[in-house]
Amino acid sequence: MHTPLGSDGWYGHAVLALSWSGGKDSALALHELRERSGPSPRALITTVTADYGRISMHGVRRELLSRQAQAAGLPLVEVEIPAACSNDVYEQRMGQALAEAPLAEAQTIAFGDLFLADIRAYREERLSRVGKQATFPLWGRDTNALAREFIAAGFQAVLVCVDPRRLDPSFAGRRFDPELLADLPADVDPCGENGEFHTFVYAGPVFSAPIACHVGATVERDGYVFCDVLTAG
């Protein structure tokens, strides 16, 4: 039996779930929502590529995803999709997850998107079809300032996926820190919002304790460069 997301009486009719990629934008969105006076997320929802057992696009192992959710103190809903997933299959799987417990109780899904209007419109339209709404706590924020705010808040992350068409593969496996920001080419968004890179957050104020992990091998797959992150301890 699942635990109702709003069982503590806090949320009333504003139960939230957070779309969680394991990266810096979703972690910062969680931090922002928890710091606000309004409702904060009661669950995380993540797409996992079943063929690989990893977070879709980011390539992070399932075990590390579970450790993030545990450290964040939130239940995790994994939506499994196949490799090379079509949009129709993705929408069917996601729609099913949103209609079932515990996400059926969530009226609002929060996202860490920053400025891509077409992505926002897509999310809002798809959620409206199932009677839910979207919220974007970081929307419109300056990405240069946001990247530095992330570091200043005490978050620690590593680049786990790089698009070699937009950023040199040598950035895969590097820590997301001031030195990395200084080294990024001028045409690369400091938050990677255009898909230049993705991150894995292993420490920060949204976690009860850091996630013990270390960087492993770097591989190229499906046109992207992935840095494997392994559990430690």
Model-based region annotation:
Residues H2-G233:
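Nucleotide-activated chemistry modules centered on ATP-dependent adenylation/adenylyltransferase
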